[in-house]
């Protein structure tokens, strides 16, 4: 469950290390985001020669949450931390590699690129 001010790891090779959620997109009163939701983020920590720099604002899709994802069969998929992948204005991933596992919930028409780049899909 991601809300405003939540800090997330970045699971791609854009050069960003940590980002902070500044808005959950999808309705004016929407409070929480979970896996597969798009959020607006600000870069808080970035590598020196990366594609992005500190203070930049991007869209991102949540790929892992510590809260977890409940499946229809009753199972729960949890992770050690929260992670996101940075997106451009066309909602395509900026990075060319994804680090760590992603969940099957991302397998929509929108995020198939992220699923195909991920080393493991749970």
UniProtKB/Swiss-Prot annotation:
Q: Which GO terms describe its molecular function?
A: large ribosomal subunit rRNA binding; structural constituent of ribosome
Per the record, its GO cellular-component terms are: cytosolic large ribosomal subunit
Top-rank taxon, per record: Bacteria
Q: Which SUPFAM superfamilies match?
A: Ribosomal protein L14
**Which Gene Ontology biological process is one annotated for this entry?**
translation
Alphabetized, the UniProt keywords read: Ribonucleoprotein, Ribosomal protein, RNA-binding, rRNA-binding
What is the similarity comment for this entry?
Answer: Belongs to the universal ribosomal protein uL14 family.
What is the protein's quaternary organization? Part of the 50S ribosomal subunit. Forms a cluster with proteins L3 and L19. In the 70S ribosome, L14 and L19 interact and together make contacts with the 16S rRNA in bridges B5 and B8.
Role according to the record: Binds to 23S rRNA. Forms part of two intersubunit bridges in the 70S ribosome.
The name on file for this protein is Large ribosomal subunit protein uL14
Q: Which organism is it from?
A: Laribacter hongkongensis (strain HLHK9)
Q: What is the lineage of its organism?
A: Bacteria, Pseudomonadati, Pseudomonadota, Betaproteobacteria, Neisseriales
């Amino acid at each position: 469950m991601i809300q405003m001010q939540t800090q997330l790891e970045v699971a791609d090779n854009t050069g960003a290390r940590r980002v902070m959620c500044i808005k959950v997109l999808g309705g004016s009163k929407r409070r929480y985001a979970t896996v597969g939701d798009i959020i607006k983020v600000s870069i808080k920590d970035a590598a020196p020669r990366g594609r992005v720099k500190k203070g930049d604002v991007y869209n991102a899709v949540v790929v892992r949450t510590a809260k977890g994802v409940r499946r229809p069969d009753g199972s729960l998929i949890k992770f050690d931390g929260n992670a996101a992948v940075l997106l451009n204005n066309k909602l395509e991933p900026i990075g060319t590699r994804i680090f760590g596992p992603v969940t099957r919930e991302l397998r929509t028409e929108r995020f198939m690129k992220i699923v195909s780049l991920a080393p493991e899909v749970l």
